[in-house]
Structures are given as C-alpha cells and as structure tokens.
Amino acid sequence: SNEDDIARINGIISPLVKNGQSLHQIYLAHVDELMCSEKTLYNYVDAQLFDIRNIDLPRKVKYRPRYKKPEFKVDRGCRIERSYADFQKYLGANPETTIVQMDSVIGRVGGKCLLTIHFVESSLMLAFLRDANTSASVIEIINLLDEVLGAKTFNSLFPVILTDNGSEFSNPKEMEKRSTIPCNRTKIFYCDPSAPYQKGACEVNHELIRRILPKGSSFDELTQQDITLMMNHINSYKRKKLNNRSPYETFSFYYGEDVLKRLGCSPVAAENIILKPKLLKK
C-alpha cells in the first residue's frame, strides 16, 4: 500500500493499541475504514510501518512466528453468486432490468476520490466526493440515496448494480440491505478481474470527467458543490447514441424532473456547457 494509506491506517490503529486493544478487536470495529485484511495489519506491524511495535500488542509477543507465505490474496468470498456470469444469467431471467454501473475515480493517490454511479439506459451519471476510498464511504452514499429517494424510487432506479473488484466495493451485503433486511434494495454483481470493458458505459463517461479533472490532478481542494456542477455540465451534454438528447433529458423522460431534483441535478443550457479544467478553476 502507499504511504498515505499506511498513515491513514496508522492513525486508526496506533492510538487504540496504546489503549490496550488487540489488532483483532480494532479490525472488527473498523473493517470498513481499514480496507485491508487483518493479516495485513500484522504484516505492517512486523515491517515497523506504524507508531506501534510487536511489543505493544497485548498477546503477539507470546507466540512463535509462523511460517509466512511470500504473499497473501484478498478474500473474494464477497463475489460468490455475484460474478459477471451470474450477472448475465440474472439479466437472461430478467431482461427488462435497468442496469446501474458503479466505479471510483481517483484523484491524488491517498487523497479525496469520487464514487460514480452511471445509469446505463439514460447515460446519466452521479458523482460523490469522498475523503478516502473506503467501503464505509460507499455504503454511506448508498444509504443517503436511499433516504433522499425513498424506498420505492430507489428500488426502481437500482435493481442491479455492476461494479469492479476494488476493495471499496467488497461489502455487498451492507450495500444490498435496507436497515436490517438483507438483499431488499438492490443486487450487487462484479465484473471479472481486469475486465473494465464489462462496464464500458461507465468508463466512457469517465473520459468526460477527465476532460475537466485530468488524470493525476488532486481533488483535495474540491467540494461536493464543484462535483455536482461538473456533473450538471456532463449530464447536459447531448449524445449521438441518445438521439442527440442529453442524459438529463433522457433520464427526465423515464423518471421525471422531480427525481432529478432530489438527486441534485440541474440542466445547463447547451451554449454554456464547459468540459475543460477551467470550469472548476477558482
């Protein structure tokens, strides 16, 4: 992991270890923020990347070090019955299903990033600024949308969500459940590893974001207001594939203006659309 991520994890775990908590306890309480396996935490402590050492851990010093494999793999249990093949099977059985694609757009590594939500049918895209690329921040946004739209509208807009294997999307059960009832607001599926083309519609729209926020640029000084403004310009941009209508107009035709207002979307007149970095220059 990069230095910023290690600093972020260190900020979470070191104070708690100094209060006498075990890594296991801390991991259970902060799994969504930590974004790594419990084993990785021990590896980082061994490598002396944190403010704490093995001697600080309540029980670690009593144990003889085990044989270490050269590397470990992230648990992909979350993908069971949610693979791309399962997605295609589901669409075969439910051909009328509206598809939503979800992804992240990264700013400066370790800094603020975006969660993007793309409605394939209308090409409308929502984007949300997040302080860190964690699964907790993704779940928070889905909960917020559920609240703003209401259960009925949310269910009709988000029957299925296709996303990639990023660790920020590795808690599907929390994304799918409304309060305590499992699988009752959406169904999460994953693209095959290294197959971004499987959610190509989303990737194409990211090219428009990159016209305004070029790769490598920092999002740290931006606000959600900036991101909403950018998406209003992108969603008002007419597309050939939509019969020369904009995503805003197309989405409005399917779901009505009221839903767009609740999502924070506003139209921008064609002659005022700017898809260059100067749109967000302060």
Which stretches of residues belong to each language-model region?
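Secondary-structure boundary/capping micro-motif
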Residues: 1-218, 222-223, 229-232, 237-240, ...
